[in-house]
Amino acid sequence: LPPNVNEVIKVISKKNKEKLQVHGAVAANWLGLTTQMPMKKTYYTTGITRELEIAGTKVKFIHSSNEKLFLFHGTEVGLAIAAMHYLGKELVNEQVIQKIKSRLNEQQFEQLKNSPLPSWMKRAVISENNYA
């Protein structure tokens, strides 16, 4: 049996004491915000940029020093942050926030609202229009 790629990635992350966050394109796809998907499993990392092949699957790690990108890494709240980071302030609008809100439970959305997000994300998330 080939190893589970996601489990191997977790072991590598733990061994190297690095944080991983799913790439924003994957996060945006999970949230139903885009149909685009990277050709390789792609993660942001606090470690070095590199590519590996694990059980025939190409995995790319892209270094980022943006600590806010790793807030709640490995959680659905972290996915929402990665998706917004990927989309950028020009594309994150009320519809995007409503889609994110529909994928998170109330506690997770509160966690997102109360986290130290970049100012443009914070404004989008706490906009009064989002409480409809």
Q: What are these regions, as identified by a protein language model?
A:
Residues 1-12:
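Short beta-edge/loop segments at beta->alpha junctions of small alpha/beta modules
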Residues 4-5, 45-48, 54, 67-70, ...:
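Glycine-rich loops and low-complexity Gly/Arg-rich segments
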Residues 5, 23-24, 76:
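Amphipathic alpha-helical interface surfaces
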Residues 13-55:
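Short gly/ser-rich loop at a beta-strand->alpha-helix junction or flexible surface loop bordering the NTP-binding
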Residues 42-43, 60, 79:
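Generic structural signal for residues positioned in beta-strands
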Residues 53-64:
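A short, charged helix-loop
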Residues 63-132:
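Hydrophobic alpha-helical interaction segments
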